[in-house]
Amino acid sequence: MQTIRKSLGLVLIMFVLCGFIFPLTVTALGQVLFPEQANGSLVKQDGKVIGSKLIGQQWTEPKYFHGRISAVNYNMNANEVKESGGPASGGSNYGNSNPELKKRVQETIKQEGKKISSDAVTASGSGLDPDITVDNAKQQVKRIAKERNIDASKINHLIDENKQASPMADDYVNVLKLNITLDKL
């Protein structure tokens, strides 16, 4: 009986410690030390939330930089996800031999009309990648300059200003940040 009492006491202590004290401590530390990140790294414009630095959005208008392809169409609306039963995040899981991947790559190449960056035709693992490589961004400059009737050198300068270095991969830019800055030109 004493063993059962000690076991139940330990379960109760661990429940309180792991279920309440630890999560509240981590949440409080996050809010104090990293308030922006702890709240989703939200981007606001005129006091209204327009996106997050960490989650990509679907950009279809030719006057904007387009992000990576998303197998889930950047759908983060919880109600739509619940109704459709579809995932809120996830890659396409298309292998190199999959005809659907080949078809999608060919369609993208046909739209862009030239050799393009690999991240322009492949989805990220989460399907919600907010960044594209600098090469991908530079390949979109001609289209954007034509649509906005502005000099391509201004857009290239904008890309260079927003470039973030990566020690293990290609340099990249955040698509949302780039498009917000583009609208200010």
From Swiss-Prot:
Record-level Gene Ontology MF annotations: ATP binding; P-type potassium transmembrane transporter activity
Location(s) in or outside the cell: Cell membrane; Membrane raft
Keyword Translocase set for record: no
Alphabetized InterPro entries for the sequence: KdpC
Keyword list, A-Z: ATP-binding, Cell membrane, Ion transport, Membrane, Nucleotide-binding, Potassium, Potassium transport, Transmembrane, Transmembrane helix, Transport
Membrane topology qualifier: Single-pass membrane protein
Domain of life (superkingdom): Bacteria
Gene Ontology terms: cellular component: membrane raft; plasma membrane
Membrane-crossing residue ranges in chain numbering: 8-28
NCBIfam families: kdpC, PRK00315.1, PRK14000.1
UniProt-listed PANTHER family: POTASSIUM-TRANSPORTING ATPASE C CHAIN, POTASSIUM-TRANSPORTING ATPASE KDPC SUBUNIT
HAMAP family linked to this entry: KdpC (MF_00276)
UniProt similarity note: Belongs to the KdpC family.
Assembly behavior: The system is composed of three essential subunits: KdpA, KdpB and KdpC.
Role description: Part of the high-affinity ATP-driven potassium transport (or Kdp) system, which catalyzes the hydrolysis of ATP coupled with the electrogenic transport of potassium into the cytoplasm. This subunit acts as a catalytic chaperone that increases the ATP-binding affinity of the ATP-hydrolyzing subunit KdpB by the formation of a transient KdpB/KdpC/ATP ternary complex.
Protein name: Potassium-transporting ATPase KdpC subunit 2
